[in-house]
A protein has these predicted regions:
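Bacterial N-terminal signal peptides that target proteins for export
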Residues: 1-10
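C-terminal motif of bacterial Sec signal peptides marking the signal peptidase cleavage site
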Residues: 15-20
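Bacterial signal peptide processing site
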Residues: 22-25
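A conserved helix-loop-strand patch within extracytoplasmic ligand-binding domains
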Residues: 28-38, 123-128, 135-147, 260-312
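Bilobed "Venus flytrap"/periplasmic-binding protein-like clamshell domains
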Residues: 30-78, 161-165, 184-215, 219, ...
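An extracytoplasmic/periplasmic, membrane-proximal ligand-sensing/linker region
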Residues: 45-51, 116, 131, 135-185, ...
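A ligand-binding cleft/hinge motif common to bilobed small-molecule-binding domains
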Residues: 79-105, 238-253, 262-266
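N-terminal segment of the mature folded domain
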Residues: 226-283
Length: 312
């Protein structure tokens, strides 16, 4: 499923040296920082990528004791964190392992990563005929924080619950209730489980508002779902702001680390297709750096800039 976001994550995660390489010995600026005591685990390409180690050094002034080549947000990275071979690991920010393993996702407080915030993409004619759709979907988005998205993913992919069950429980817990809708819409998704889960949340909220909803999930890649949106085969899609923008603009490089600016540019690019993007969520699915709770507690880590503080 991860390849669905490879266009955005390729810029954020693409490759470096295949073996572990020492990164901490030469920089006097990094001596004595928390990072200089720790090993980073990530994909082999991480050291040379602007949204991975290169960016951590340039944006945060972080140099690690060592780098351990593992995988792109997968089980090898998770294992390295759990067995102590690494203390910091690159995962995706909504990876269910974060909730399942109790990892601490370090806040990207200097906005290193491109803004892949969750955002609904909707046909404009559907919104014009049913204003409650915008109200309801933006209501969902307002509640969708990072912890909520990660937990939804965990419940489906780790705990084995049905997406419909998980969506219904979350909607009830958040008190999401709307009315005044009519007619019918179709909610679609790519073949990525997370987009299907969010799509199910969208569908149930709209049904609660009085709208008949058809679900067309697991349609395929963006090369399938965007033509489906434009043709009217589907009306609503949960997307990622930066990734969606770079898809519709043919990789023009307009996405930035600013979610508001990226979302505005996405709306601009969608306008001539009869589509628009609604509000963006606080929740993202992009590169993220995690530590175990024990490491976070030991060093007082909550955000990436904490790694540049003097070691205790």
């Amino acid at each position: 499923m991860r390849q669905l976001r490879m266009a955005a994550l390729g810029a954020a995660v693409v490759a470096l040296a295949v073996s572990a390489c020492s990164l901490g010995g030469g920089s006097q600026a990094s001596k004595g920082t928390i990072a200089s005591q720790l090993v980073l685990a990530g994909p082999p390409e991480c050291p040379e990528r602007p949204f991975c180690l290169e960016g951590l050094t340039g944006t945060y002034g972080i140099t690690f004791k060592d780098f351990k080549a593992t995988d792109a947000g997968g089980p090898i990275t998770i294992e390295a964190l759990e067995n102590g071979d690494a203390q910091v690991g690159l995962l995706f920010t909504s990876d269910p392992a974060i909730a399942a393993k109790g990892f601490v996702l370090l806040e990207d407080d200097k906005q290193l990563q491109l803004a892949d915030n969750i955002i609904p993409v909707v046909r404009e004619d559907v919104l014009a005929g049913n204003p409650v759709i915008e109200e309801a979907l933006n209501g969902v988005i307002a509640k969708l924080c990072q912890a909520a998205l990660t937990d939804l993913n965990k419940q489906v992919t780790v705990d084995g619950k049905a997406a419909a069950e998980v969506a219904a429980a979350w909607i009830a817990a958040e008190g999401l209730s709307f009315s005044g809708g009519s007619g019918s819409v179709t909610v679609g998704s790519t073949n990525f489980y997370e987009q299907e889960i969010i799509g199910e949340v969208f569908a149930q909220v709209l049904e609660g508002a009085g709208i008949d909803v058809e679900r067309k999930f697991q349609l395929g890649a963006r090369e399938v779902v965007f033509p489906a949106l434009e043709s009217g085969e589907i009306d609503i899609l949960a997307e990622y702001a930066a990734t969606a923008l770079e898809y519709v603009n043919n990789k023009a490089g307009e996405a930035s680390t600013d979610p508001a600016a990226t979302s505005d540019k996405l709306r601009e690019r969608l306008a001539d297709k009869g589509l628009t993007a609604l509000d963006f969520a606080a929740a993202t699915d992009q590169n993220g750096f995690v530590v175990t709770k024990a490491t976070a507690d030991r060093y007082g880590l909550a955000k990436l800039s904490d790694l540049a503080k003097p070691a205790p």
